[in-house]
């Protein structure tokens, strides 16, 4: 099982400790070879007060499934995309397998890059302060996106309100997500293709659209969101279900 347990991409949920322990119970009862893969990409990416979550490894140890668990995270969304430093936790055969695969990919870590990160952050508080500055940049853009999405009639669909991460999910009430994306493109706004968050890019309901408000400037975001809500209204009015 592969999942993003905090600010889950794209809908933003934070898995509760109770649900995580239940996942561990169900998976381990199914098979002692069942593997839990956690992509903790948004571990420290809160931009609003968020639910507390115990460390995943602590929960895995409590459930007795540390040999079946792999927890990974990186600084790709903290410092440089694809150029940060990364971390993982595992145990037993799972750890042995990761070490074997990793050894065939790279001789050793980029120690200069590790040194750069240590010099920049200094300590854990330095990381927290840096992510607070991230939040101050990200939060206003989400607020802009919400202000436009709130203009849409509820019959058109609904949207998520994450407290961290980088994405908003808009779910159309009719199977028109692909049409919305097409209309946006025709009006000069490119957004993530409909279905991108599903296996093989197939959304059986054709309803889920992922919005990433952080990439563009506030000014461009306002234009893009005006285009988006117009596209949703047009697509919704074109089809009767």
Protein language model annotation of sequence segments:
Residues 1-2, 72, 86, 117, ...:
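Generic structural signal for small/hydrophobic residues in well-ordered secondary structure
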Residues 1-51, 239:
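Active-site phosphate-binding strand-loop segment of PLP-dependent enzymes
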Residues 61-139:
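Conserved core segment of the aminotransferase class I/II
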Residues 173-177, 216-218:
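Helix N-cap motif at beta-to-alpha junctions
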Residues 118, 132-146, 156-171, 185:
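Conserved glycine-rich beta-strand-loop-beta hairpin in the small C-terminal domain of fold type I
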């Amino acid at each position: 099982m592969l999942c993003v347990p905090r600010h889950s991409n794209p809908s933003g949920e934070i898995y509760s400790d109770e649900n995580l322990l239940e996942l561990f119970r169900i998976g381990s009862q199914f098979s002692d070879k069942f593997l839990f893969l956690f992509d903790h990409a948004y571990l420290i990416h809160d931009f609003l007060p968020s639910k507390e979550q115990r460390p995943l490894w602590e929960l895995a140890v409590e459930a007795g499934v540390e040999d079946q668990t792999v927890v990974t995270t990186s600084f790709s969304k903290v410092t440089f995309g694809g150029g940060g430093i990364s971390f993982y936790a595992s145990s037993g055969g799972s750890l042995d397998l990761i070490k074997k695969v990793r050894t065939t990919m790279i001789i050793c870590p980029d120690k200069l890059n590790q040194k750069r990160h240590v010099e920049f952050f200094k300590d854990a508080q330095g990381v927290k302060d840096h992510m607070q500055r991230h939040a101050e940049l990200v939060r206003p853009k989400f607020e802009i996106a919400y202000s436009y999405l709130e203009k849409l009639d509820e019959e058109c669909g609904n949207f998520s309100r994450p407290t961290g991460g980088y994405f908003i999910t808009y779910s159309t009430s009719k199977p028109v997500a692909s049409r919305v994306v097409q209309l946006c493109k025709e009006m000069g706004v490119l957004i993530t293709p409909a279905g991108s968050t599903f296996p093989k890019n197939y959304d059986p309901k054709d309803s889920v659209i992922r919005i990433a408000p952080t990439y563009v400037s506030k000014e461009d975001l306002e234009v893009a969101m005006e285009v988006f809500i117009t596209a949703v209204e047009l697509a919704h009015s074109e089809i009767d279900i």
